Each structure stands twice: as C-alpha cells, then as structure tokens.
Amino acid sequence: MKLLVIGSGGREHALVWKLAHSRRVSEIIVAPGNAGTATETKCRNAPVQVTDLDGLLALAQREAVNITVVGPEVPLVAGIVDCFRAAGMRIFGPTAAAAQLEGSKAYAKDFMARHGIPTARYAVHTNVDAAISDVRQQGAPIVIKADGLAAGKGVIVAMTVTEAEAAIRDMLSGNAFGHAGARVVIEEYLDGEEASFISMVDGTHALPMATSQDHKRVSDGDIGPNTGGMGAYSPAPIITDEIHARVMREIVNPTVAGMIADGTPFMGFLYAGLMIDVHGAPKVIEFNVRFGDPETQPVMMRLQSDLLDLIEAALNGDLDKVQAQWDPHPSLGVVMAARPYPEMPITGEVISGLDALPANVKVFHAGTALDVAGRVVTAGGRVLCVTALGSNVSEAQRHAYGGVASLHWANAFQRSDIGWRAIMREHTVR
C-alpha cells in the first residue's frame, strides 16, 4: 500500500516512522518532508508545500496513493480533506467545517458552551476598548488568545492587567498575528496541571491514544514565551484511570456527538488540551484537529499496534471494533531548537552527531533540510526531537538527554527539565 503523509515537522516524521513499520506499507511519500523523512525506511520526500492543495491532490493522483494522512492544521483548515474527498481519494482528517474547532478559538468556545463541555469562562472581542474594559473588570491573571491559527504562539497568559492590555493592542491594533488576531478570546485563568488527551475519531466513535504532557514555555521552570512545544512525555501521570474515564464521558464523547448534531461530523485526530484541577476535574483549554507536536513523538514510541490498521478502521467507521496496544514504559522527547526561537531562528547550520547516537534513542527531525553537499542543516525553529523510552520517566529523561549531548550545531538550545512534573511525582512516591 502506498501512503502520502502531508507535513514537514517532527510530528510527521514520527507518524511516517510508525507507519513504515506496517508490513502492508510499500512506500510513503512525504510532502514536503524534512531531512529525517528523506532518509527513513520506505520513504521519499516530494517538494510540494502543505498549502498547495491542488499540488498535493495532483501528487496523490499521479502516485496512485491509497491513503493520505494530514499532519499539520493549516491544510486541514484550508479544506484539503474536502478537496481530496471530492476527487474520490481516501484521506484521514477533518473537513474544513469540522477543522474550525482549531481554526477559530471563538468557534470552539461557542461549540463547548452550546454542548455543555467544561471549559473556562470567556468573551470574544473585535474592539480594543471593549476588550480592555473587559480585562480591567476581570483583573489578572487572565488569558488572551488570538482567534485564528498562530502556530501555537497566539496565547498570552497575562499575569498583570498591563500585560493583558498590551497583548490585546498587539493582536487587535498592532496586527501581531495578522488575520488570526483580528478577533480575540479573553478567558479566565485556570489553575491546575495541563495534559494532552488525543483520540482517533471516525465520525461516530473515539479511540483514545496514550496521554501525554507538553512543555509550552521556552525556558526551564516553565517561564518565558509560549512556543509550539519544547518537549513532551507519555503517559501523563495526572490522568488517572478515573480522570481518563471522566474525560471520555464529559469531553471527548460529547464533542464527537456535538459535531454530529451540528452537521459537521469529525474524523481525524482530536486533540483536547486539558487543565486538571486539584479535585481531578478536567476542563478544555483548547481543541486541535491533529496530533500534537511534540506529543506525537513520545506517543508513537509507545504505540505497539499497527498505525495503518487503526487509520483504516477509522476510515471505515470501525474504531469501536479495535483497540490500541501500548508499551507500558514511559517515553520522553526533548526538543532541540535554534536560537533565538520562538523569534525568527538562525538557519543553515550543519548538525553534527546524528551518526553517533546511543542505540536507545530515536531522533525525529522537524526544522531540518539537506544542503547541496547532502549534510543535515537547520531549517526552522524547532529542529529535532530526541526521544527515548525508560523504565520510568527519570530513566527516559536520562536516555533522551544522553542523545541530546551527542548532537551539536552553533545556535542549538533546549530545556534541561523536560518531564520535571512526572519525575517529581516519582520521587514523591518513593
């Protein structure tokens, strides 16, 4: 079977790596891919960008692709699934209408309010003065979100009213996020611990994937600006069996049912970013309509089932007939980034050490490319995700950072504390 995977990040490299394990997969085309997917078994890159929907469809048709899997949110929100389905091509992901769960935070908040899905109190504004008046009335801390897609960076957790006002002006007047910031969502600040809860959905049924926890802030101790994610581990210990059941009952299943009721049934990876309070009550911080990045990398390290089998079950509406099997050992991934990410990174630097990695480490490429000499060079902000399994999170962290120590380029940096919450729990249990 020939597959097309759309995207160029660490998430796509991890999906491709896992799909290539399937005996039924003969070849995977990755568009546009990166230096890691270019050298992965059964894989080759195609130079078609994720925003070129016509080019991607033409590629899939020319190559007689059996199934297409979409990694990033941009083509999903742009309607790539609608485009492929209209041409009779099998593709796994939500339609443009269903992808509004991520494409518009205001849409997602209204959807949750309409269907009784627990989330933070909120208000939507397009006027600067009205938004600032709202913030002054509520006080800080408070959360300011750009309505549209902003590559994971359109959320400001303002600890003061002054900071909140500046964020509002940047988004609504200063064009900080372009069209994505033409409308803002102001939310109450939620206390608790975050977790990523990702499910495969076939339109009617949801199959939960392994839980995970991301590290959004750029610096150790969870300080500094938000990023697309600086590392993740799986499973998330905060999600106990009881909380897991509650998330399915109160959030995932009502979301799937609500999308059907609204006439926009959801198929694809449904990502619920959660806040779990001290009482174990989950609330939705955000919905994404695709697998998380970097959560995909440690989650795929643990998946023992054939990913192609699961995707086919979803395409056939049969997710209620399958189960996903997981390695019981935790996994952890450390993102190595290029300074001064999340600002515009320095690119084109040669990465050394990729051929001298410990055997227990898997490196998933994100912002990488091959130069004219065939060397792997940096090509983005988040460059690599160094991932490993362990008997516990402490060991997985040790293995992953052992891999990080082998890799070098001039402007590399990474957090040194990925997994700290889980490790603190492990030490407390002892």
Curated annotation (Swiss-Prot):
InterPro entries attached to this UniProt entry: ATP-grasp (IPR011761), ATP_grasp_subdomain_1 (IPR013815), PreATP-grasp_dom_sf (IPR016185), PRibGlycinamid_synth_ATP-grasp (IPR020561), PRibGlycinamide_synth (IPR000115), PRibGlycinamide_synth_C-dom (IPR020560), PRibGlycinamide_synth_C_sf (IPR037123), PRibGlycinamide_synth_CS (IPR020559)
Q: In which pathway does it act?
A: Purine metabolism; IMP biosynthesis via de novo pathway; N(1)-(5-phospho-D-ribosyl)glycinamide from 5-phospho-alpha-D-ribose 1-diphosphate: step 2/2
Question: GO:BP terms for this protein?
Answer: 'de novo' IMP biosynthetic process; purine nucleobase biosynthetic process
The residues that hold Mg(2+) are E286, N288
Q: Which reaction does it catalyse?
A: 5-phospho-beta-D-ribosylamine + glycine + ATP = N(1)-(5-phospho-beta-D-ribosyl)glycinamide + ADP + phosphate + H(+)
Report the cofactors. Mg(2+); Mn(2+)
Q: Which residues form the signal peptide?
A: none
What Pfam families is this protein classified in? GARS_A (PF01071), GARS_C (PF02843), GARS_N (PF02844)
UniProt key word Magnesium: yes
Query: Which protein is depicted?
Result: Phosphoribosylamine--glycine ligase
**Which species is this UniProt entry from?**
Xylella fastidiosa (strain Temecula1 / ATCC 700964)
